[in-house]
Regions:
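Polytopic membrane enzymes that build or remodel cell-surface glycoconjugates and lipids
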Residues: 1-443
Length: 443
């Protein structure tokens, strides 16, 4: 095992990418033959504009208004729409092509995780590779990768991670070209998925954690981050002009607003449980805003305080640990039902694909702890701790890979997808309707 770690440390970026590519193909090859399911039919098969590449219409035509009988929401995602239409030009209605693109994007994202953790974690190549592999093979990622519609998560993350990576390089080299690239990629991410609104705050938090003493660099931070906030303001203006209301206008006046707010700690606790102990994974995961909340709230804050204590205890990795916590929390703000997402009675959507990007924050935190408690430097390569750690990692990775391959199989059709959902969401009326429709369609 020490020799293996030593060999990994000598690998270059091309070899690292090939390892990730090989693992990604193994894990997700079973989804390539799967057909379009559920809302993929709405956005691709039944989309009357799927073959139209009129850029003006894509960017300036208001999205379809939502109604109680439609899966089409008031999303403003022109880059995503453009990509779907380009994929149609290439693959037509052959679902295999769309699946292959998803798999490739996921592999690229894992490679970007490797690059970013290398920079933030102090050039620990083996540790960065381990974290990238976990991102690649984690079972919770199946919903974003095996589902063709999950490309919104994959593409937004790709553009966002590239934007952040270019910003890191810009901070190191002070190249205006890298800064402009970072800004443009952020703009592109906004045009793919609304969750990208957190990036300016993520970059500001990065400066708070990693920059020189904040009080001595306020002017520099404002100068470097102002462009992101200007782009964000412009995005909200465009979105408001086309859709007619901003994303957050229905939050504060909603009588159920505080019911949803008190649900947030429990939702975060649930997501942490799914990340560290992935089990009972399924589509259309829901949370009830009327459920008891005191125990889950107390439990979450106990964990958060414990993580904060660890961050300040682990001196050499303090900044990375704090940044990892912040990444996890900040990146979930758009999906924590502050504005309700797909509500049925008192139930709110708590989808597993919401964790695709926040998982990076958890990996940064775990990586910081790992580099402190199980150092992977050359002088420690022969320690028994590393040998035991390597065995644990291998066994855990094998379990994760098997679980992900199994989880993928539920996306082979509408019937297995909604049968799986209703195993855990027995009172989900819409789920029963969707399963009945699937049975009818299949005779």
């Amino acid at each position: 095992m020490p020799k293996l770690f030593s060999s990994l440390n000598r690998l270059g970026s091309p070899q690292i990418f090939l390892i990730l590519f090989f693992l990604g193909v193994i894990i997700y090859s079973n989804v390539v033959s799967y057909p379009f399911v559920h809302d993929e039919r709405i956005f691709i098969l039944q989309n009357p504009s799927i073959g139209d590449l009129n850029i003006k219409d894509i960017f300036l035509t208001p999205p379809a208004a939502p109604n109680d009988f439609s899966l089409v929401n008031t999303y403003y995602r022109p880059f995503l729409e453009l990509l779907n239409r380009l994929l149609y030009k290439v693959f037509g209605f052959n679902s295999s092509g769309y699946h292959l693109v998803n798999i490739l994007l996921h592999i690229l994202n894992s490679f970007l995780v490797f690059q970013i953790t290398q920079i933030l974690g102090g050039k620990r190549k083996t540790l960065s590779l381990i974290l990238a592999v976990v991102f690649l093979i984690h079972p919770i990622q199946s919903e974003a990768v095996a589902c063709i519609s999950g490309i919104s998560n994959l593409l937004f993350t790709l553009l966002g991670l590239f934007s952040f990576l270019f910003y890191l390089w810009f901070s190191e080299k002070e190249s205006i070209f890298l800064h402009i690239l970072s800004l443009l990629l952020f703009l592109a991410a906004l045009f793919v998925k609304e969750q990208a609104v957190i990036f300016p705050f993520l970059i500001l938090f990065y400066e708070f954690c990693f920059a020189p003493p904040f009080n001595s660099s306020v002017a520099r931070v404002i100068k470097q981050t102002a462009g992101f906030f200007i782009i964000l303001a412009g995005y909200f203006w465009i979105r408001t002009s086309l859709i007619g209301f901003p994303i957050t206008n229905m939050a504060a006046a909603d009588p159920e607003f505080w019911l949803r707010i008190r649900l947030i700690p429990g939702s975060l606790l649930m997501y942490l449980g799914l990340i560290f102990f992935p089990h009972h994974l399924h589509y259309f995961r829901r949370v009830d805003m009327l459920q008891p909340f005191i125990f889950s709230t107390v439990s979450f804050f106990v964990i958060l305080i414990g993580a904060g204590y660890l961050a300040f205890f682990v001196k050499g990795q303090r900044r990375l640990l704090i940044f990892g916590i912040g990444w996890f929390l900040l990146s979930q703000i758009p999906t924590l039902n502050i504005v309700p997402i797909v509500m049925e009675y008192s139930f709110l959507l708590a989808a597993e694909h919401f964790m695709y990007f926040p998982l990076v924050g958890i990996l940064l935190f775990v990586g910081g702890l790992g580099s402190y408690f199980i150092p992977l430097s050359q002088e420690n390569m022969k320690s028994k701790v590393n040998t035991i750690g390597g065995i644990v990692l291998f066994l855990s990775g094998s379990v994760f890979m098997a679980a992900t391959i199994k989880q993928n199989t539920y996306w082979r059709g509408d019937i297995p997808l909604f049968e799986r959902t209703l195993q855990f969401e027995k009172n989900f009326g819409r789920g029963h309707l969707l399963l009945a429709q699937a049975y009818t369609a299949h005779g």
